[in-house]
Amino acid sequence: MSVGMAAPRAAFSCDPDRSRGRQFAEPPSSNRSAFRRDCDRVIHSNAFRRLKHKTQVFVFHEGDHYRTRLTHSLEVAQIARAIARQLGLDEDLTETLALAHDLGHPPFGHAGERALDACLRDHGGFDHNAQTLRVLTALEHRYPGFDGLNLTWETLEGVVKHNGPLTDRTGAPLPRHAERGVPIGIAEFSQRFDLEIWSFASLEAQVAALADDIAYDAHDIDDGLRAGLFRVDDLRAVPLTAALIDGISRRYPALGESRRGAELVRELISHLIGAVTAETMRRLGEAAPRSVEDVRHASTAMVAFPSETAVAEAEIKAFLWTHMYRAERVMAVMRDAEAIVADLFRRYCEHPADLPPDWLPADGPVAECEADRFRRIRNFIAGMTDRYALTEHQRLFDSTPDLR
């Protein structure tokens, strides 16, 4: 099948007409599927718009062409839909999960997440997937009959299982959650609206998760080249990108550095999409699932890179870790960003009246217990954009890092 050609709807895809429903019953739309409604609600949410001013790697004022959480999410959605189309999956659900997967990220990317996690260590920590679930089910206030967006079970399942199952069938946390347990927000919500966190997610969710990896790898290379942290030929240290660079050099021997980088990113995306699609088709052929439930109850994920590509993808991540994420220029800014988030958290804890009126409890801050106050402050800070966090810090403190 040619890349971009749509396969017939597969029996193992999610069918919007057979959705497990929403938390709050709503009449169906006359002209949109249940999953298309989910996607539209995400796009029109306040949280989605805020992604425009949330950091991917570089802070918002460093350049107009660097990725933000918004541009990253759009790129993930494009890649995810391309894969879903070839596999015969529901593209609307796949797109929804791609667009929603980063809604819970705090300002300043992983620096903000580390800071909030440290501040909340005695109160369950901070997990951005759990925060995304809170945004989708509680923190958006747009509809008269419910808080949140009232999305389908399938969308919420995909958000929660972005990294796969969280527990085994007995409820014991899987290794990545063994030390601290399943994030409290996910565990508590799943008790009310069972998301079967012991099972795999749908293929649509698995595709969105792998598309996230592909987008990160390719587009962080693009941003790193643009920032001058490394050059195209430095990527010859990775066998996969070295092979792609050699091919580009043969076809376009006089190509300038900027266009070489753009061509490398384009070819890397195409290569990774082809690899994950082929491996997924192979696994589906072996497992022969006849329904989405067969996918959920499988012994392993169905959407994956082939083993040699998984090694290559890990090598790309290792290169980016050394040359970009751990570059002193980036690390210096992220250290200051962590300090800003930690300062704000402590300030609001000590002086809750500094919170905006809409974020104060109805009975006043004095009547609120510590755990509730911490949760309220967590939700407020996690929703901030980079620029709002800086503005708040400047309002509340005498000195604020300029993050340059």
Swiss-Prot record:
Domain of life, source organism: Bacteria
Pfam families hit by this protein: HD (PF01966), HD_assoc (PF13286)
Question: Which InterPro entries does this UniProt record tie to the protein?
Answer: dGTPase, dGTPase-like, dNTPase_2, HD/PDEase_dom, HD_domain, PHydrolase_assoc_dom
Ranges for the region named Disordered are 1-33
Give an example GO biological process. Answer: dGTP catabolic process
Q: Which SUPFAM superfamilies match?
A: HD-domain/PDEase-like
> Per the similarity annotation, which family is this?
Belongs to the dGTPase family. Type 2 subfamily.
Q: Can you give the residue ranges of the HD domain?
A: 69-217
Q: Does the keyword Hydrolase apply?
A: yes
Name of the protein in question: Deoxyguanosinetriphosphate triphosphohydrolase-like protein
Q: What are the entry keywords?
A: Hydrolase
Q: List the GO molecular function terms.
A: dGTPase activity
